[in-house]
Amino acid sequence: MMAVASSRTPAVTSFIAPLVAMVGGGQLARMTHQAAIALGQNLRVLVTSADDPAAQVTPNVVIGSHTDLAALRRVAAGADVLTFDHEHVPNELLEKLVADGVNVAPSPQALVHAQDKLVMRQRLAAAGVAVPRYAGIKDPDEIDVFAARVDAPIVVKAVRGGYDGRGVRMARDVADARDFARECLADGVAVLVEERVDLRRELSALVARSPFGQGAAWPVVQTVQRDGTCVLVIAPAPALPDDLATAAQRLALQLADELGVVGVLAVELFETTDGALLVNELAMRPHNSGHWTIDGARTSQFEQHLRAVLDYPLGDSDAVVPVTVMANVLGAAQPPAMSVDERLHHLFARMPDARVHLYGKAERPGRKVGHINFLGSDVAQLCERAELAAHWLSHGRWTDGWDPHRASDDAVGVPPACGGRSDEEERRL
């Protein structure tokens, strides 16, 4: 009997990509979009301008303000979840979105601990978590009482909105602290005052948590600050005792669980000179201290954030190499005449292993316009190369006087450990 071909068309299974809405169009949203592409997801972003970093790369854009409820509703419409590139959305607007049925991650109840430093300090202190000694200030004269009590240098901080050293005054004396507090209060900005910690260094413990309650922790890193801005991240933190690293990871996972965080949580820490850990700040989103994970970890913070807010199983957060160093590229006081593209060309000629991530932002003094990752095993060498590369991209000038026209292996920056010639070998040639 002859077989007869079926005339029926095989069923086609359509794929509907999960839609994640993100408030904010900066570099964090831009890099989250890059992670979403690999996962087959659709990221919609709320931006203030079509020139914002994320708007340059994603086609799904809503232009509007994060303080406009109508704009927030537009970006959230039909999304599986709404998450954040920054913490500046007014909490009362997020509560209205939740009432509309929007899945907001992290929730407004969790996010307030990253928005309001005083609320965060009070919650953590009540839970027995070590924080610097602090006080909320309603009258500048209250600073005198606090300063007398702690008998230490003091710092005045805006309760909301400060970042990268903004909204923070490392007071010279009590009078300076009073003046800054008076300025803030006159502008309607609430302030707190805290002791200036005698610290060894600053650390960051980065974790992620899903609605299911699964947690994942990356290695604890050291952050290097200059003028209030992070310039370097070393992963893992050099010479950090295992017990202290484990304690920092456990603390971050505990805070994520107790605060109900969904997504990435960065816990900024002070390591004191006597080996204690104090919580400085919280961020409930991908964080500058986690940019190393793009190249240096099995799962980047951006992919992990997407996994977490969509309640996927979380990825492996282990490092892929012994050491990764990340250097921020900051806008120079005087932008160089050489184009960014030409600077990039010269950088790759000298350092072909540099992992460059540029944000599509106009160069302005001190502005974060990109970052560079270097992977390897020698901390000192990686830090040196990262700082050289970042300064070159910022200023168009090599701080070590390197000559791109010198014909040697050094022209491509191959260190001896990677097969390049040592200085002694060069002298023998």
Curated annotation (Swiss-Prot):
Keyword Metal-binding: no
Cellular component aspect of the GO annotation: cytosol; plasma membrane
Residues holding ATP: 117, 157, 194-197, 202, 280-281
Keyword annotations of the record: ATP-binding, Ligase, Nucleotide-binding, Purine biosynthesis
EC class of the enzyme, as a word: ligase
Annotated EC: 6.3.4.18
Keyword Amino-acid biosynthesis: no
Annotated ranges, domain ATP-grasp: 121-310
Record-level GO BP terms: 'de novo' IMP biosynthetic process
InterPro entries: ATP-grasp, ATP-grasp_carboxylate-amine, ATP_grasp_subdomain_1, PreATP-grasp_dom_sf, PurK, PurK_C, PurT/PurK_preATP-grasp, Rudment_hybrid_motif
Pfam (any one): PurK_C
Any further remark recorded for this protein: Was identified as a high-confidence drug target.
Subunit note: Homodimer.
Function, as annotated: Catalyzes the ATP-dependent conversion of 5-aminoimidazole ribonucleotide (AIR) and HCO(3)(-) to N5-carboxyaminoimidazole ribonucleotide (N5-CAIR).
Family (UniProt): Belongs to the PurK/PurT family.
Name under which the protein is recorded: N5-carboxyaminoimidazole ribonucleotide synthase
Species the sequence originates in: Mycobacterium tuberculosis (strain ATCC 25618 / H37Rv)
Organism lineage: Bacteria, Bacillati, Actinomycetota, Actinomycetes, Mycobacteriales
